[in-house]
Amino acid sequence: MGGIDQDNFSNISWQSDRLGAGSSAAHQHGGQESEQPTHNQAEPEPNYTSMIVHGMGLGDEVLECNVSSPLKENDGTKDAFVSYLVTTHTTFADFQKPDASVRRRFTDFVFLFKTLSREYPASAVPPLPDKQRMEYVRGDRFGNDFTSRRAYSLRRFLARCALHPVLRRSAILHTFLESPDWNATMRSRASRSVSMSGTSSGESGNAHYGGGSAGGGSTGGGNSLANSVFDNFADTFINAFTKVHKPDRRFIEVREKSDKLDEDLAHVEKVVARVSRRETDMEADHKDLAEQFQKLIVLEPGVEGPVRAFAASVEDTAQGLRGLREATEQDYLGSLRDLAAYSGALKNLLKAREQKQLDFEQLTEYLNKSSAERDVLASGGYSSGGALAGAGGFIRSKIEDVRGVDHEQSRRERLRKLELRIEELTVEVERAKKTSELFDEEVIREVSDFERIKRIELKRQFGSLAQSHTDFYDATIDVWEKYVKEMEKEGAVAA
């Protein structure tokens, strides 16, 4: 983990201050829910975000979130699902109460994630735990182990959002945390998104600058949508084989450090997974040892008291090992995987930034080519058929001769179209440059936020893991000291 602690990005002048943009609308809040969970799960620590300190662009507002108590609902039907208790403590003014408690299912978290990703494209929105898991294939996605691990992951998702200077002020996040009528919010936002996508589909073709002129006839919504999808696919396919001409060294270093972080996390994950398997084996061995000593009581009734006490102590140790294994596997091991996924979200943001720069460079190259072509036409190069004309100009000239076109008039018409194209391209280049520069600044701030959130999360996870080990060994010492005292009282152990 030494490589992780060295990710300080000291050679990049990043600013962690961020203006708190966006206002949140007030929402109605009903009574708090208090369902009884069906699983005996170790409660995740609710004060995960209490490590926030002032001076990091977060403001004075407190936002602490916790996810716990998975509950299987509609049991016995095909529509069964698991809901999670989401509790929030906050000092935000737009919350109706400082403490809120609601139940949300995983699809609610998915809707929140997609909405945040759509509304904040320049932010590295923390990812959700992967839904494509073997538990869905084996059918044990309602098991205690799976739901507990998911509760920890969902808690980390909300904690990251609460630590983000922009996402923590999002209106949709606040609604998610306290609204008693969340389903109505999802329906209204879904219908609004569909209507907005329908109205903007006809304009998407004009937003993408192409070499040809705009068509005069109008097309239907379905054709416009199909053309837009095809254009986006074509752009993605072409840009996959296009590299940035002037890569920014700052973001190259960020990607290299992210790759190193992923490598370190993968290595630590393997080690922790091996430790978890050893703890499972030790738990099974202790249980087996306790069972064998229970059988010994039948063979040696004279030592029933000491043997029974010893077997009970071994059984208590096995229970402690089980709690330690659950803390290691469900919380800490899951946090490593979640952090690797969060690093992937940052890499996706770097790819989006690179795409903005690539758009600017391609538009600039297209503008330069159009300007050079205009200069050649203005000097009469194509019309004279000289060396400047080239093969294309020569062929065009011959075709115009066959068609009986006036060369001078054709040259002036092409020159006029080039002037219009250059004028449009100049505006687009300036716009793309400004967009790329602004996106660069946002990504720099996002990297700084990612580093801060990562440090807080790792500190909390290390502290939680150390505390679970301390609790286990304290409990084990108490168990065996109690056993020794009992044996001393019975005279089975020499004082």
Swiss-Prot record:
Topological relation to the membrane, as annotated: Peripheral membrane protein
A GO cellular component annotation in the UniProt record: lipid droplet
Region (Disordered): 20-51, 193-219
SUPFAM superfamilies in the cross-refs: BAR/IMD domain-like, PX domain
Composition bias type Gly residues, residue spans: 208-219
Disruption phenotype: Decreases vegetative colony growth, invasive hyphae formation during infection, and virulence on rice.
An MF annotation (GO) of this entry: phosphatidylinositol binding
Domain PX: from-to ranges: 62-184
Top-level division of the source organism's lineage: Eukaryota
Ranges in coiled-coil conformation: 406-443
Biased composition, class Low complexity, residue ranges: 20-31, 193-207
Positions that bind a 1,2-diacyl-sn-glycero-3-phospho-(1D-myo-inositol-3-phosphate): R105, T107, K131, R150
Keywords tagged on the record: Autophagy, Coiled coil, Cytoplasm, Endosome, Lipid droplet, Lipid-binding, Membrane, Mitochondrion, Protein transport, Transport
Location, primary (coarse class): cytoplasm
Subcellular location: Cytoplasm, Cytosol; Preautophagosomal structure membrane; Endosome membrane; Mitochondrion membrane
Gene3D superfamilies membership: Arfaptin homology (AH) domain/BAR domain, Phox-like domain
Pfam families: PX
Any one GO biological process: reticulophagy
Entry's family note: Belongs to the sorting nexin family.
Domain remark text: The PX domain binds phosphatidylinositol 3-phosphate which is necessary for peripheral membrane localization to the perivacuolar punctate structures.
Annotated function: Sorting nexin, involved in the separation or division of vacuoles throughout the entire life cycle of the cells. Involved in retrieval of late-Golgi SNAREs from post-Golgi endosomes to the trans-Golgi network, for cytoplasm to vacuole transport (Cvt), and autophagy of large cargos including mitophagy, pexophagy and glycophagy. Required for invasion of the rice sheath.
Protein name listed in UniProt: Sorting nexin-4
Gene: SNX4
